[in-house]
Design a protein with these regions (language model features):
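Active-site C-terminal subdomain of aminotransferase-like
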Residues: 14-15, 190-287, 291
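Conserved PLP-binding catalytic core of the aspartate aminotransferase-like
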Residues: 295-328
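Active-site phosphate-binding strand-loop segment of PLP-dependent enzymes
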Residues: 115-171, 184, 192
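A glycine-/small-polar-enriched, mobile loop at the entrance of the PLP active site in fold-type I
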Residues: 4-60
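Conserved beta-loop-alpha segment that forms the PLP phosphate-binding cup at the N-terminus of a helix
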Residues: 53-82, 86, 90-95
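Conserved active-site segment immediately N-terminal to the catalytic lysine
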Residues: 178-190
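PLP-dependent enzyme catalytic core of the Aspartate aminotransferase-like
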Residues: 339, 343-404
């Protein structure tokens, strides 16, 4: 990969210059009062993006460190968990549950297809589960499941906690954490938040804190025990704060500087405007792809605002396609996963790349590679169709670029 390639993969994402510049600071000790206040402010901003009043816990590492910490903090040996699978990434939760001595029971749904709530309801009625998990935005299929709130209600009706993997949706798709009553909502820096790889976070409900504190068998995970980060009373209050959030481990200071700036950009744009921008650019990209005679893997009503999985025409190998895309057009992205590893590519349109310039450039490059591989289509069809989508949107409201 070259330094001037455009990252159109489903994470990591390109990073705005503002965010990169925010890290260019002298070394600082994370336990100073000054940094503690910065830490608190950053987590308050993150809670706004989560749309929650719950406490958000930052976990150093990738998104998987957040998933593992959340699960190991609540699951004890022998506990049952219902794991909803609608793509590759749901399986991670099952592995973690089993790894700490729990019993994961998977319920599988076809990639890119609707969930059958009746199946989930029947499964929950068959036994006692401590936890239900699912992925909000399945990066492997390009499907977003806004039915997560309905799944949360089913979980709570049967006495279970609800964990939502929002790794590739937070900051790019509407995620009403409190309205859906999500108990453990996991995300990370390097997807739609558009900050550097290295931090995950978990928004934790009071219900989940109570389960952690009521464990019969203590959490064996020292690093990932979320109770280390539980807010403690601050007496006397400082600057109006009555609680202090401890740092369970030393915070990655410069990653926090970057995260703070990325969150500042999100809140400056406004959540509603940001979600609309992602939806528009995702629509333009998908319509362009369809104009080439291709169909995204996810059905239209589940189409993700942050990532699209595109099965290639018969006989075209993903590895060859991606090589042409990068070497000849400077677009770096990733192949499909699971059964689509060799036959599909995935394009991320999130964060700073969810803009017309990146979408149109990527569509032009995909057209050129398909033509080189002998796929028949009307030249310019993808770019022209995407431009039509943007033009139609302009009549409603101008398309806004993202400041760098």
């Amino acid at each position: 990969m070259k330094t001037d390639d455009i990252l159109m993969c489903p994470g990591p994402n390109d990073i705005a210059d503002r965010v990169l510049r925010a890290m260019v600071r002298p070394a600082a000790c994370p336990v100073t009062p000054e940094f503690q206040e910065f830490y608190e402010q950053t987590l308050d901003m993150l809670a706004q993006v989560y749309q929650t009043h719950n406490r958000v816990v930052p976990i150093p590492g990738s998104g998987r460190s957040g998933v593992e910490s959340a699960i190991t903090s609540v699951i004890e040996p022998g506990d049952r968990a219902l794991v909803i699978i609608c793509g590759t990434f749901g399986h991670l939760a099952a592995r973690v549950v089993n790894g700490v001595g729990g019993q994961a029971e998977e319920v599988d749904f076809p990639w890119g297809e609707l969930l059958d709530m009746g199946v989930i309801r029947d499964k929950l009625a068959q036994g006692t589960y401590k936890l239900v998990t699912m992925v909000h935005n399945e990066t492997s299929s390009g499907a977003v499941y806004m039915s997560a709130g309905e799944v949360a209600k089913l979980a709570h009706a049967h006495g279970a906690l609800f964990l939502l993997d929002a790794i590739s949706s937070l900051g790019g798709a509407d995620l009403p954490t409190d309205a859906w009553e999500v108990d453990l909502c996991v995300s990370c820096n390097h997807k739609a938040i558009a900050a550097p790889i290295g931090h995950a976070y978990v928004a934790v409900s009071e219900r989940a804190w109570a389960v952690m504190e009521g464990r019969q068998d203590p959490c064996r995970n020292i690093f990932g025990n979320l109770l280390q980060w539980k807010a403690q009373p601050l007496d006397p209050p400082v600057d109006g704060r009555t609680l202090r959030r401890p740092q369970g481990v030393f915070t990655a200071v410069h990653l926090f500087y970057a995260l703070h700036e990325a969150l500042t950009m999100i809140l400056e744009e406004g959540l509603e405007a940001r979600f609309a921008r992602h939806l528009l650019n995702a629509q333009a990209f998908r319509e362009g792809i369809k104009a080439l005679g291709l169909q995204p893997l996810a059905r239209p009503e589940l189409a993700s605002p942050t990532v699209t999985c595109i099965p290639l025409p018969d006989g075209r190998r993903a590895a060859d396609f991606l090589q042409h895309l990068q070497k000849e057009h400077g677009i770096f992205t990733l192949p499909g996963l699971g059964p689509y590893r060799d036959t599909a590519i995935r394009i991320g349109h999130m964060g700073v790349t969810a803009i017309p310039r990146c979408v149109l450039h990527t569509l032009y490059a995909i057209e050129a590679v398909l033509a080189k591989m002998g796929h028949g289509f009307v030249p310019g069809a993808a770019v022209n169709r995407a431009e039509q989508v943007y033009a139609e949107a302009e009549t409603r409201e101008p398309v806004k670029a993202v400041a760098s």
